Swiss-Prot record:
GO terms for molecular function: ATP binding; sulfate adenylyltransferase (ATP) activity. CDD domains: Sulfate_adenylyltransferase_2. SUPFAM superfamilies: Adenine nucleotide alpha hydrolases-like (SSF52402). It is an enzyme of class 2 (transferase). HAMAP family: Sulf_adenylyltr_sub2. With CysN forms the ATP sulfurylase (ATPS) that catalyzes the adenylation of sulfate producing adenosine 5'-phosphosulfate (APS) and diphosphate, the first enzymatic step in sulfur assimilation pathway. APS synthesis involves the formation of a high-energy phosphoric-sulfuric acid anhydride bond driven by GTP hydrolysis by CysN coupled to ATP hydrolysis by CysD. Its EC number is 2.7.7.4. Signal peptide: none annotated. Pfam families: PAPS_reduct (PF01507). PANTHER family: SULFATE ADENYLYLTRANSFERASE SUBUNIT 2 (PTHR43196:SF1). It comes from Acinetobacter baylyi (strain ATCC 33305 / BD413 / ADP1). The gene is cysD. It catalyses: sulfate + ATP + H(+) = adenosine 5'-phosphosulfate + diphosphate. This is Sulfate adenylyltransferase subunit 2.
Amino acid sequence: MLMTEDRLTHLKQLEAESIHIIREVAAEFENPVMLYSIGKDSAVMLHLALKAFYPAKLPFPLLHVDTGWKFKDMIAFRDNMAKTHGFDLIVHQNKEGREAGINPFDHGSSKYTDIMKTQGLKQALDKYQFDAAFGGARRDEEKSRAKERVYSFRDTKHRWDPKNQRPELWSLYNGKVNKGESIRVFPLSNWTELDIWQYIYLENIQIVPLYFSAVRPVVERSGTLIMVDDERMRLKEGEVPQMKSVRFRTLGCYPLTGAVESEADTLPEIIQEMLLATSSERQGRMIDHDEAGSMEKKKQEGYF
């Protein structure tokens, strides 16, 4: 008996929708790429892509825009995943930004993010001439992402115009682009944070250990717990790292990512904690709080 849509669980419906989108992009575009930020959403998106083309190899590479300030655990996890699954991994860093010493301490989160993330991403997309790029953004994360299409059109400068988006009826997507233009594709658009965690649990998906609670060295700044991940962390006068049981709901560059105090060190405990949470997972991402509407402005400039 065929399993009709109304007999599928909501997670299986989401899975089927995402796999359809991933296969559609692989068939429709000449040179797609999957952006790999190493977080939980990237882990789910990669898992779905591997499912979509199993037992064949992924028909597109993964791209990680490395700022040089990611958690050590993230880089180790990235390299291990590439080795385990054998996918093509492109690691790109803004060479000019690195040589200029751009960092989150001296230059602030806004300028640092623009140069090392946004400009770095645009450099990589131009260098390899990708015409479609998968991203792991979800509509429930943040208000600017809530109004973005699954197929998000970008012009030749990689800019997004929220007032000029293409209609998407049912499961029909318009991927037509001219030379130099591209599409950002978000297969997880309709997933929620809870969906992501439940799917990780049910599918036994590997994720970075930072998502699980452990005793880690942190300093508190403006109510945010920042983990001291290496010797480059600049401590303020009189500031001493404290060992606390913390975990991360979202991952980014370690000087700009806040931890939460938690004892949740298993997936069921994380899911239970998430159900009781009253704040967004991106509350710990300092780049989201640069100014009002900062995420939408970043996306208009070419950010993920």
